[in-house]
From Swiss-Prot:
Keywords: Cell inner membrane, Cell membrane, Electron transport, Heme, Iron, Membrane, Metal-binding, Oxidoreductase, Transmembrane, Transmembrane helix, Transport. GO terms for biological process: aerobic electron transport chain. Probable ortholog of the ancestor of E.coli AppC/CydA. The chain crosses the membrane at residues 23-42, 95-114, 130-149, 188-207, 220-239, 398-417, 476-495. Belongs to the cytochrome ubiquinol oxidase subunit 1 family. Probable cytochrome oxidase subunit. It comes from Haemophilus influenzae (strain ATCC 51907 / DSM 11121 / KW20 / Rd). Heterodimer of subunits I and II. Residues 43-94, 150-187, 240-397, 496-521 are periplasmic. The lineage of its organism: Bacteria, Pseudomonadati, Pseudomonadota, Gammaproteobacteria, Pasteurellales. Its cofactor is heme. One of its GO terms (molecular function) is oxidoreductase activity, acting on diphenols and related substances as donors, oxygen as acceptor. This is Probable cytochrome oxidase subunit 1. It is a multi-pass membrane protein.
Length: 521
């Protein structure tokens, strides 16, 4: 039966994955609009203005729903994860506050000028507004991913036993965290691919129907070029992000590669496996010798530490965490009784406080952490190993979808260069029906990032099990049902409007120049 923590996780997963349906398209379309309008201002060709306005209409529908779902998601830090907000809010809240005050206000202000300023602003000023929308969207993503990067690999912070909170010690370390920056660039390029693939798919639909040829062909050309470059960036930056995560979170690396044993370097790569987390082995696996180690460590002499060895290391850290928790409670008692603490006790605590989070893992099994049994200690260590199967297959689904996207954007780019886009209808059909591919890759990537971090809300600092609010299961089932109903309405509205305007094409602009307007005369 699902408890409060499980239901809180389920609700956050639903809202986060749903919200991220809209985010990558916003990121990608915003820069495609910049490219199209820049060409319009540079050449004066009206077709590029029409392209900017039409794709901007679809961007606007997506943007509105992305903002709405994002607000709902952020509220959960206060409603469902109140102890998390208390424990790490000083750090986690800072980039989110900057995002709201700087990036979100920038993009939301200029998005109004983008839509309503065509007849009120000069070409140059309107182009500047479009650039600000794109810049604001990307800046917003950066600060959100700085916050998420800290959850994955905490830097620039330390625990204060007096306030029982994590406190920021260096903002630059938080901001320039390598994990955060590589995640940001990888997510950004994935968004660019999503926007490009979206334009390619709908342009392919127009070309297959033989409608608005010039408009569709030019849209296809912009998207094919932008998408091909972005798809290469995704592969390169994805490798970099994976490398950084492998150094910061060896458990996640071992889980997504289903490495239960520590193999001599370089480790094999498993394209297919049936992981058995309970017995810490693969029931079936196909191995490609050496490839896994070369890809994951970029060397032939570095090991990928297996999950069995990582569990043993984590058991040692759980024991150290018990000592950290004991010293923490002692310091608190001394402070309360005497108004000051023993410096020797404080020095001892500082030596082991990095393992305090491992001690908190025991809260799932006992309120008296210091007197935890051997079985409870071993169970807490087992909890540090996430369920391998979902991580293993999510990673491979992401790679497979990303590889297909790269091949398709390459094909579109080559055909566009040859000026033979319409000569291979099969390519256009595959681009059209392959539209879900970017979302499959992105959602699998985010699932891997978050599920692979379990059992931690903030890696090796705060377990998920102690982060949740004091709610009832009834409260959570009600809110989950309400959110599902609301989000169902949102997706119906989104799909209706997207299909409506995508089918109309540039005729939706009512300029009198395009297919449905001409055929109605």
């Amino acid at each position: 039966m699902l408890d409060v923590v499980d239901l809180s996780r389920l609700q956050f997963a639903l809202t986060a994955l749903y919200h991220f349906i809209f985010v990558p398209l916003t990121l990608g379309l915003s820069f495609i609009l910049v490219i199209m309008e820049t060409i319009y201002v540079a050449t004066g060709k009206e077709v590029y203005k029409d392209m900017t306005k039409f794709w901007g209409k679809l961007f606007g529908i997506n943007f509105a729903l992305g903002v709405t779902t994002g607000i709902i998601m952020e509220f959960q830090f206060g409603t469902n994860w109140s102890y998390y907000s208390h424990y790490v809010g000083d750090i986690f809240g800072a980039p989110l506050a900057i995002e709201a005050l700087l990036a979100f206000f920038l993009e939301s202000t200029f998005v109004g000028l983008f839509f309503f300023g065509w007849d009120r602003l000069s070409k140059g000023k309107h182009l500047l507004a479009t650039y600000c929308v794109a810049f604001g969207s990307n800046l917003s993503a950066m600060w959100i991913l700085v916050a998420n990067g800290w959850m994955q690999a905490p830097t620039g912070s330390e625990f204060n036993f007096e306030t029982v909170r994590m406190e920021m010690t260096n903002f630059l370390d938080l901001w320039l965290n390598p994990v955060a920056q590589s995640k940001f660039l990888h997510t950004l390029s994935a968004g660019y691919v999503t926007g490009a693939f979206f334009v390619l798919a709908i342009s392919s639909y127009f070309l297959l129907k033989g409608r608005d040829f010039e408009f569709a062909k030019r849209s296809f050309s912009v998207a094919a070029t932008f998408g091909f470059i972005a798809s290469i960036s995704v592969l390169i930056l994805g490798d970099e992000s994976g490398y950084d995560i492998g150094k910061a979170q060896p458990v996640k690396l071992a889980a997504m590669e289903a490495e239960f044993e520590t193999h001599p370097a370089p480790a094999p790569f498993l394209p297919v496996a049936i992981p058995n987390t309970a017995e810490m082995k693969n029931d079936f696996a196909i191995e490609i010798p050496y490839l896994g180690g070369v890809i994951a460590t970029r060397s032939i002499d570095k090991e990928i530490i297996g999950l069995k060895d990582l569990q043993a290391l984590n058991e040692t850290r759980v024991r150290s965490g018990i000592r950290a928790y004991e010293l923490f409670t002692q310091l608190r008692a001394e402070k309360k009784a005497n108004g000051q603490v023993n410096e020797e006790t404080k020095a001892q605590f500082n030596e082991v406080k990095k393992d305090l989070g491992f001690g908190l893992l025991l809260k799932r099994y006992t309120n008296n952490v210091v007197d935890a049994t051997e079985e409870q200690i071993k169970q807490a260590a087992r909890d540090t190993i996430p369920n391998v199967g979902p991580n293993f297959w999510a990673f491979r689904a992401m790679i497979a979808a990303g590889g297909l996207i790269a091949l398709l954007t390459f094909g579109a780019f080559v055909q566009n260069l040859r000026n033979k886009v319409t000569q291979i209808p099969l390519l256009l059909k595959v681009l059209l029906w392959g539209l879900p591919l970017p979302w499959i890759a992105i959602e699998c990537g985010w699932f891997l990032a978050e599920y692979g971090r379990q059992p931690w809300a903030t890696y090796e600092i705060l377990p998920v099990g102690v982060s949740a609010s004091n709610l009832s299961t009834g409260d959570l089932w009600f809110s989950i049902g309400l959110i599902c109903a609301l989000y169902l309405a949102f997706i119906i509205v989104e799909m209706y409007l997207m299909f409506k305007y995508a089918r109309l094409g540039p005729s939706a602009l009512k300029t009198g120049k395009y297919y449905f307007e001409q055929s109605a005369k």
